Amino acid sequence: MRLARTIGTVTLVEPHASMRGGALRLLVPLGPADLAAGDGAAEPLVAWDDLGAGDGQLVAFSEGGEAAQPFRPADKPVDAYVAALIDRLDIAGTTGTTRHPTATRNVGKNR
């Protein structure tokens, strides 16, 4: 599982029938340096989100075959899945703690 920040929503004109009940979110993965700076510079990716993450939300996501595991035995065409909404992340370092407040959760907005 990795950490990312949501930066947008991907809208489909005609989604696959199994893609109802959630949203495709655009994520920027965050590495250790990105977390310390509070920003990410990695290439964005698209992830399935049925938790209702809002723009700017810090999330944990999984990729590959593991991303489809929550939907077994049903098939869902996903390669990345938002597995958790992060309320707060404290990073201990030599200068103290960096806190990452997250955006207000948009419950139901993307459902």
Cite the ranges covered by each PLM segment:
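C-terminal structural segments of small proteins and small subunits
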Residues: A60, E66-A103
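Short, structured beta-strand/loop micro-motifs enriched in basic residues and often containing a Trp
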Residues: A37-L45
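Short aromatic-glycine-enriched beta-strand elements
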Residues: S18-L27
